[in-house]
Amino acid sequence: MHLTHLSLVDFRSYPSLDLTLGPGVVTLVGRNGQGKTNLIEAIGYVATLASHRVSADAPLVRQGASHAVVRARIVRGDRAALVELEIVPGRANRARLNRAPVPRPRDVLGLLCTVLFAPEDLALVKGDPAGRRQFLDELLVARTPRMAAVLADYDRVLKQRSTLLRTAGAARRAGGKGDLRTLDVWDGYLASYGAELLTARLALVEALRPGVAGAYAAVAGAQAAVGFEYRASVPQPAPDPVRPDRERWEEAIRAELVAARPREIERGQTLVGPHRDDLLLTVDGLPARGYASHGESWSLALALRLASFELLRADDREPVLLLDDVFAELDVQRRSRLAELVAPAEQVLVTAAVEADVPAELTGTRYVVAAGEVLRAS
């Protein structure tokens, strides 16, 4: 899989851009603030319908413009697809596939598959659980695009249920009882969607575990006992060879929701479910978040991305690799090892502030990015 063309209209700093791309290594070099990361962000948006830098879409639209457009031509084997996304702040975004409208933007998910390496990746190790949950969920959708609907349904139910809890809590504090007649219904939805999401995450962690350990050794250049464990907010149900895992987890979530209801009403929050889960990362038995050195943390963050890359390749979904200013964060040894590991990919896009940050192992087409223009280097 690779991109052959990227077109932008009023996306971030670009009034307009048409960029022809090819397989292999593509390097984008330019000083900070010239628009390199905006290109990576646009490509990632086509793959995930989200930015890795901001949570809302409004900042993606160039100041003064009413909307932004991102077009990408994707080649996979002997097939090509043209994806167009229109980003409209305050309104529903629109999508086209091969110039024909599709009912929902998420219908184009899966056409482009990417793995992004970025300076923000250090937060996968050192940051809050939300970043690690997002890492798992984005990979779930990349492998199984229908999981986007499960995530959307879970988020919708979570918001509705939490609103009901806040309303009930306010009523009780005012001396009333609060209307909880529909809470049982929302509990059922939350447990059902939550169990599907949780079991999918558990299966993903098991699939990733061997790759993370191997990638860590390859990047760090040293062996270490790397731990990779999913921590659910719900006690693990007892093993049952007859009942499916999803059914047992759904029952466990329901039971915890019942037990937590008084606290949830008091706090106005849903305290049970996969939105409260975490991924515990350890190095030599110690939590990486608190004990890993800077180098160990970077090796582990890169290992998560490399393991994702290999897992998608094993699924016959060769991803486009996006490396956004990541080499500047690494020492010389890790730069060289990472370059050797990603070089065989079908397409690799690398950004760097200076040419010296790009390892010699990554040779290919080079562009210079300056003041919103992207010019091929001679």
UniProtKB/Swiss-Prot annotation:
Keywords: ATP-binding, Cytoplasm, DNA damage, DNA repair, DNA replication, DNA-binding, Nucleotide-binding, SOS response. ATP binds at G30, R31, N32, G33, Q34, G35, K36, T37. SUPFAM superfamilies: P-loop containing nucleoside triphosphate hydrolases. Belongs to the RecF family. CDD domains: ABC_RecF. Pfam families: SMC_N (PF02463). GO terms for molecular function: ATP binding; single-stranded DNA binding. PANTHER family: DNA REPLICATION AND REPAIR PROTEIN RECF. GO terms for cellular component: cytoplasm. Disulfide bonds: none annotated. The RecF protein is involved in DNA metabolism; it is required for DNA replication and normal SOS inducibility. RecF binds preferentially to single-stranded, linear DNA. It also seems to bind ATP. InterPro entries: DNA-binding_RecF, DNA-binding_RecF_CS, P-loop_NTPase, RecF/RecN/SMC_N, RecF_2. This is DNA replication and repair protein RecF. It is found in: Cytoplasm. Its main location: cytoplasm. One of its GO terms (biological process) is SOS response.
